[in-house]
């Protein structure tokens, strides 16, 4: 398997109590099954990582999205972004879906912000990039997106 065809997982752990970041980079076309590549399937992976590592954020996007994100000094939304904050549609109306973490039945400690719930995020789709960019701008306007320096 070529490295360009595989997913990338970056987990940054330092002397703090929890990892400052988890980034999941997806190839442009994933070799996994449709279920594994679905919004629901990837959100389950993010939720599981959050329950184990309690990170400051988790970002899920193709590698090619990085130069297209709005802010160089903050995490990008890409396909999904987990933040350890309870967020509402009133705060982030541009989000196509907000998934509470943990799931129903337990106290919510964070939110997975989804830019594209019905397809795999693609930088070749201008609408996907535009939605992710609008979410990033909204989060910064509301002081909800931390800078890397603050993580």
Report each predicted region and the residues it spans.
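Internal, hydrophobic cores of structured domains that mediate oligomerization or house catalytic pockets
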Residues: 1-64
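C-terminal interaction module
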Residues: 64-151
């Amino acid at each position: 398997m070529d490295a360009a065809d595989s997913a990338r997982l970056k987990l940054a752990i330092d002397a703090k109590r929890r990892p400052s970041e988890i980034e999941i980079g997806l190839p442009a076309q994933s070799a996994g099954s449709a279920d594994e590549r679905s919004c629901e399937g990837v959100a389950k992976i993010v939720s599981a990582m959050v329950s184990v590592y309690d990170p400051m954020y988790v970002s899920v996007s193709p590698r090619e999205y990085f130069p297209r994100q709005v802010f160089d000094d903050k995490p990008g939304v890409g396909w999904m972004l987990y933040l350890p904050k309870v967020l509402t549609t009133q705060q982030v109306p541009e989000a196509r879906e907000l998934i509470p973490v943990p799931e129903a039945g337990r106290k919510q400690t964070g939110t997975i912000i989804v830019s594209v719930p019905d397809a795999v995020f693609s930088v070749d789709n201008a609408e996907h990039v535009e939605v992710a960019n609008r979410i990033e701008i909204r989060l910064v306007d509301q002081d909800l997106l931390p800078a890397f320096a603050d993580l």
